[in-house]
Amino acid sequence: QINTNNFQIIYPVSFETEAQRVANTLQKVIVEVSKSLNKHPKKISIILQNQSVVSNGFVTLGPRRSEFYTTPAQEFDSQDWLNSLAVHELRHVVQFDKLSGRFSGVPFIETYLGAILNLEVPSWVWEGDAVGAETALTTTGRGRLPSFELAFRTNTLSGIRYSYVKNYLGSMKDMTPGYYPLGFFMTTKLRRDYGTGILDSIMTHVKKNPFRPYNLSRSSKKYTKMNTRQLHD
């Protein structure tokens, strides 16, 4: 393992060279990734899984850690896969720490905290904001890929408009973007129209008013005069 001030990198011995590079990358980007949410995350364990055909990564609070599946995806952007994972998953760490506050890392409580946060904030916010980070802070990112916006662009040019719920949750019948592209465009619109600190303001308000129905939507309404459906439309 590699220990820095901010990360504990856990990896197979055979993967040490790449683990060193991941550690250096994370240390380099942590300030920029956390800046717009005004939250420097606590130290976290990063587990590198190199014996898998899955190309993915995740952050969880029970127990608090992030795992990188290091096999590159066949269809992704032109950037190094581990660099993309570092920025995207680190943004999730910052998001969770922003909302969990002093309860982050507390045994037992953290297990339920993740479920509570996902009730408070819809998936399109988590993922759209993280895609925005990887796009803004790297030379590529999914926000620059034509294939990423394919469904949105096709429907728009065809004069097809679906509801917020359908675009978010998807359809077995019609082509819809899903919550990654939806979230990217909605969070980008928020930053473009209300400044880079708008998500910080909204998430802070969510944190101060826990367990409210439609918490994210109501917090958005406070700062933008629009709930999530109005923002989508």
Locate the predicted segments by residue.
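Juxtacatalytic substrate-recognition/specificity segment
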Residues: 1-116, 120-122, 139, 215
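Acidic/His/Gly-enriched intrinsically disordered linker/tail segments
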Residues: 63-66, 80-85, 93, 98-196, ...
